[in-house]
């Protein structure tokens, strides 16, 4: 969980740094500095904050504002007073589920290509899921956060884990990989970028500034045929503490390493993921292959090729319309990951009549508007459009575009997984807070598959 994530989640639930400090026992000054990117908290401290944020009941937090909502505990449920809403399967729900089933099949029984890949900053394995399904054997990986690593190991039980901290990976670790596997064809990963900023004013000594450098240093030792880096799209505008564009530094380093490289802005919805999710992808190709870097063509939505008309984007409804309809506080009897947070009644009243694509902040009646926040918060998704970006706060109704299009509640974990293109057989373990964080930060497996499949077909065969 980054400092930005903590600040965003605190603001969403109206929790001050001082209160968070009291709850966790972590000094407020340290929390503040971490949110500003000026120092690193330990993994133990970050996990402690994440767990406490998840456990905090929104009602308890909002009692701090009891003067505004002093009668909220005595309101009759407005949902119970109305006919129960419902939805039916969309025409393309079956098609989308077949896409996920095919992805699962290829992950379970991947093509026998003999191609080897390594992964760093693996998270729960979203990118690796797609890479394996495309026909690459993941022979080594690393992940710092134990909660995320536990989920990864459930789904990739035979992968060799390198030291959790990428800065602790030694030359002998790399030599052992090369000894065991002779060569590595593909290296993938998403080094964190919190040490950089748009203005280049972050602390020069911030350890996170070096994570990209460690990733590239490891790549130089391994010398894979192709290197892939995934990150937030904003990275292309970020600067290091010396004022240089991070993207240029990366490209220059690839050049010195003997690679041709470029970066591409992509949106996951163009590759079959039912979600607007903009990312930047760096592709570096070893010069001896005598090929230039490129990226997979889009497969869905408006096509730039007049002779190859792409099918429409998959939508929110296409992804989830076969699931049980749930209102606030309800739980599916069929799926342990499909349950809805029980939201305060006054929040339900703010949102119950809000149409798709609109926010409670847009309500004409000022008494039905949240007291603070932006109009992207308390906002409904749209059923017949790709979902907004699934964030780490998807279970918080006050978050950014987290409200279900039809039900008056935040998204469930199953819905978030579907919108991220994880097949239903993907396994989870741990507390809800870390699970939500790692799902919200994951690379959609379907995007990873299309990128890796293109790399295989254009640079490996």
Give the positions of each predicted feature:
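Core alpha/beta nucleotide-donor-binding catalytic domains of modification enzymes
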Residues: 70-223, 233-237, 243-245
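Recognition helix of helix-turn-helix/homeodomain-like DNA-binding domains
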Residues: 25-41
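DNA major-groove recognition helix of helix-turn-helix/homeodomain DNA-binding modules
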Residues: 42-66
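Short catalytic/ligand-binding loop motif for oxyanion handling, primarily in non-cytosolic enzymes
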Residues: 128, 194-198, 235-238, 272-275, ...
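Conserved Class I SAM-dependent methyltransferase catalytic core
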Residues: 210-285
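Short basic helix-loop element that most often maps to the first helix and adjoining turn
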Residues: 4-19, 23, 48
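S-adenosyl-L-methionine-dependent DNA methyltransferase catalytic core
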Residues: 27, 59, 69-139, 253, ...
């Amino acid at each position: 969980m980054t400092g930005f994530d903590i600040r965003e989640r605190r603001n969403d639930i109206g929790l001050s740094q001082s209160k968070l400090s009291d709850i966790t026992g972590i000094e407020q000054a340290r929390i503040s500095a971490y949110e500003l990117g000026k120092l690193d908290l330990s993994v133990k401290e970050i996990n402690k904050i994440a767990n406490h944020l998840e456990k905090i009941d929104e009602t308890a937090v909002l009692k701090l504002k009891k003067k505004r909502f002093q009668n909220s505990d005595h309101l009759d449920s407005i949902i119970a007073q109305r006919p129960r809403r419902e939805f039916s399967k969309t025409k393309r729900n079956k098609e989308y589920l077949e896409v996920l089933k095919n992805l699962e099949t290829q992950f379970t029984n991947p093509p026998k290509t003999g191609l080897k890949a390594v992964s760093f900053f693996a998270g729960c394995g979203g990118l690796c899921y797609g890479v394996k399904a495309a026909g690459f054997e993941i022979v080594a990986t690393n992940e710092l956060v134990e909660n995320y690593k536990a989920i990864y190991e459930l789904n990739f039980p035979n992968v060799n884990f390198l030291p959790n901290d990428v800065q602790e990976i030694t030359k002998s670790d790399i030599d052992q990989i090369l000894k065991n596997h002779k060569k590595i064809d593909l290296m993938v990963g998403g080094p964190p970028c919190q040490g950089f900023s748009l203005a280049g004013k972050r602390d020069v000594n911030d350890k996170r500034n070096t994570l990209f450098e460690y990733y590239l240093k490891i790549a130089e030792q391994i010398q894979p045929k192709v290197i892939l880096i995934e990150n937030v799209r904003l990275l292309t505008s970020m600067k290091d503490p010396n004022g240089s564009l991070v993207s240029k530094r990366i490209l220059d380093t690839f050049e010195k390493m003997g690679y041709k490289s470029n970066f591409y802005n992509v949106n996951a919805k163009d590759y079959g993921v039912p979600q607007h999710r903009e990312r930047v992808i760096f592709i570096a190709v070893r010069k001896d292959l005598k090929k230039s870097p490129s990226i997979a063509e889009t497969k869905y939505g408006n096509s730039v090729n007049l002779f190859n008309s792409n099918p429409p984007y998959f939508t929110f409804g296409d992804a989830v319309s076969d699931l049980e309809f749930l209102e606030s506080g309800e739980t599916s009897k069929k799926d342990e990951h499909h349950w809805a947070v029980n939201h305060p009644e006054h929040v339900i009243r703010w949102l119950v009549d809000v149409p798709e694509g609109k926010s409670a902040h847009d309500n004409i009646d000022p008494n039905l508007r949240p007291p603070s926040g932006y109009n992207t918060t308390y906002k409904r998704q749209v059923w017949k459009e790709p979902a907004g970006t699934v964030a780490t706060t998807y279970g918080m109704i006050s978050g950014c575009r987290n409200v279900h299009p039809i039900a008056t509640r935040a998204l469930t974990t199953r819905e978030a997984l579907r919108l991220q293109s994880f097949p239903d057989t993907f396994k989870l373990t741990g507390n809800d807070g870390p699970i939500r964080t790692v799902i919200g930060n994951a690379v959609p497996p379907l995007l990873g598959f299309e990128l890796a499949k293109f790399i295989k077909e254009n640079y490996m065969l």
